Amino acid sequence: MRRTALRRPEGLDRYRILGKIGEGTYGMVFKAEAYASSSAAASSSSSGGTKAKDSGGSAAAGEEEEPMVFAIKLVKSHKEGKNDVVLSSATVREIKLLRELNHDNVVHLHDVHVDPREKTLALVFEYADHDLHDIVVQSKQKPLSEYTKKSLMYQILKGVDYMHDAWVMHRDMKPQNILVVGHGRKRGQVKLADFGLARLYKEPIKALSDVERVVVTLWYRAPELLLDAKHYTKAVDMWAAGCIFAEIVNGRELFCGKEVEGSKAPFQKDQLDKIFKVLGMPTPQTWEGMEHLPEYPQVVQMGRERKYPTQSELKNAVKFGAGRSGMALYDLISRMLEYDPEKRITAKEALEHEYFKQIEPEPRDWAFDEPGKEPVAFRTQTFVVTWRTTEWWSAVSFWDVFAGREPP
């Protein structure tokens, strides 16, 4: 695994706020650009920066380069006992992993800055205009071409394969955690993001379920996790990727179960019900060892309560299309949604699947720029706060906005 140096920043005064693009219990996310004096330094520290309004070629001699654009995540402190803690275990893990990971299809972490006075942590990432969820939602009005779908899928697999080769499980693969660059030379480039639940999995000292009992967002959670497997593998990421691929094809989620409110239990009956209705009921004959999983008796009871298909109905649930391409895509996603994690296809194997290697169109790294076609355009990310002018944002600091010390 190649290590990339992480510069110690002088502070966030090198960045100008363009707007706030997100807010949650974790804190806030801002879109920002580096001031001219900082752009060159940021560019030389990494190739992961995003140029604003980049039209494709490098700047001509004597021509000014556009400022680099970033997403800056300000993380709130939280209580652990009587102390205010800025660096949660998830944040520390994300920083450590992203310092080590270096791949075109994994989001790049440029800077880390801690403000002791504000008790706040700032993470400076490369900026992407969309997440995959945005693209899927917009595809209902603007259907994606076969080229765009295939190129998105292929890049996701490249990112997952790189992670797994580095002994990293993501454990929260979902469309919202997959970013897509929307402009410039990297239009349509995929970036796996949000590594807060990711972890190294080589030779774990203890059962992974002892560390975090529930991982992966419900709709993308593998059946072995729902049955409370104490030890699980990178195959959980491949199940999630299979759900995501079906979503790209269909324009909607595949398994939309309802989580028991307030429950932290791995077993979620409604989610398994949604899976069984599409893929059929697994048995110890088709999934070796499932009878030893803690929640297997619940599956037996579900089989007594209602009749599930004995064979997969996936062909009826996903619009695979006709011909050789449709059959190959069905085979690929079926192998990603294999119940038995030991039989589930790996990212490396999936990259060599005939759907990508033998059937046109050939997938590329720029999913929005299909050769010989007009470039695809999508609505870009909007700011959460829309009534502030650019001049207003320029006059305030990140910390002022974050702490509520905003000028009128």
Language model region names:
Residues 28:
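Conserved N-lobe ATP-binding subsite of Hanks-type protein kinase domains
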Residues 53, 62-70, 74-102:
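Conserved N-lobe beta3->alphaC-helix segment of eukaryotic protein kinase catalytic domains
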Residues 102-111:
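Conserved HxN/HPN-centered segment at the entrance to the catalytic loop
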Residues 118-131:
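Conserved short submotifs of the Hanks-type protein kinase catalytic core
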Residues 152-153:
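Activation segment signature within eukaryotic-like protein kinase domains
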Residues 279-334:
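C-terminal lobe substrate-recognition/regulatory segment of protein kinase catalytic domains
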Residues 357, 361-408:
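C-terminal intrinsically disordered, low-complexity extensions immediately downstream
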